[in-house]
Design a protein with these regions (language model features):
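Post-transcriptional modification and biogenesis factors for structured RNAs
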Residues: 1-150
């Protein structure tokens, strides 16, 4: 299982997600452009002393990622507020790619349009809240996915 961040903007979120990846022995995949330098001290600070243990891969853009990794469609899980299916009902696989967009704009529309049936949402009880912090959403999703395969 892998966590994929497409164009992350806030280093603290990426650092926190990196720490989660270390705790769960998952790969963290970053798709450029990034809103910070991967060597940024704020990324390492959020990941604390664990950042050096993050299994991290980077790709120049979405096409580079898709063409290099060639993930099967059944392993792709896009997380976005417009998802019609709850992340509780997603058919996770052991090789799932849990994919999240940037903090300000989410996943690009062209990515969402490629696989509209692979978009999942974290349910919100209160309609005043449309999304969660990226690191919180990624952590919630990965623990839900691992629940199926733990």
């Amino acid at each position: 299982m892998k966590i994929v961040l497409v164009n992350p903007e806030i280093p603290h979120n990426t650092g926190a997600i990196g720490r989660t990846c270390v705790a769960l022995d998952l790969e963290l995949i970053l798709i450029k452009p990034l809103g910070f330098s991967i060597d940024d001290t704020s990324v390492a600070r959020a990941g604390t002393r664990y950042w050096k243990y993050v299994n991290i891969s980077q790709y120049e853009d979405w096409n580079d990622f898709i063409n290099t990794r060639k993930p099967p469609i059944e392993d792709i899980f896009l997380f976005e507020e417009i998802g019609q299916t709850s992340f509780y009902d997603a058919p996770y696989t052991k090789n799932s790619y849990l994919i999240f967009g940037s903090e300000s704009t989410g996943l690009p529309q062209d990515i969402l349009a490629e696989t509209p049936d692979r978009i999942f949402a974290l349910p919100m009880k209160n309609s005043k809240v449309k999304s969660l912090n990226l690191s919180n959403a990624a952590t919630a999703a990965v623990y839900q996915a691992l629940k199926v395969h733990w």
